[in-house]
Design a protein with these regions (language model features):
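General helical structural elements
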Residues: 7-8, 22
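Sec/Tat signal peptide C-region and signal peptidase I cleavage site
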Residues: 16-22
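A generic, residue-level signal for flexible/boundary positions that often mark functional hotspots
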Residues: 15-16, 51
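Contiguous segments within soluble domain cores/interaction surfaces
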Residues: 22-129
């Protein structure tokens, strides 16, 4: 009986350690809408989620962003990003100019409370007519 209790305790400790050690890899950025219209003042939005729980991360601080056409071999075609408010928990939105149709790569980095490492992500958006 004691052995079963000890084994259960070890299993719980391992599960907790794995979650704690996941660090920045325990989070994921996802596009809210992967296809957007090309043009000026386009809003692109990403959702930051904790992988283990699936819950949105609402208190992240975005520390770096870049959007360019590197998926279409035009990495020099970049556009500035301006943060805009979002009413949805865990959603981070940006206004940008997507001057051409094609694939645009949003590179993003965020600090999440309680995580020593920076959470990074790359999300591809498709700009259409």
């Amino acid at each position: 009986m004691i052995r079963k209790i000890l084994l259960a305790g070890v299993a719980i400790a391992i599960a907790v350690a794995r979650t704690a050690l996941a660090g920045a890899n325990g989070y994921v950025f996802e596009p809210v809408k992967a296809e957007v219209k090309k043009g000026d003042d386009v809003i692109v939005s990403v959702r930051l989620k904790h992988k283990a729980t699936g819950k949105p991360v609402t208190d992240a601080v975005i520390v770096q962003t870049r959007i360019d056409m590197s998926p279409d071999a035009m990495g020099e075609m970049a556009s500035p990003l301006t943060p805009v408010p979002s009413n949805e928990p865990g959603v981070y939105s940006f206004k940008t100019d997507l001057s051409m149709q094609g694939r645009w790569l949003l590179s993003i980095a965020a600090k999440v409370q309680g995580e020593p490492d920076t959470v990074v992500g790359e999300i591809t958006f498709r700009a259409t007519r």
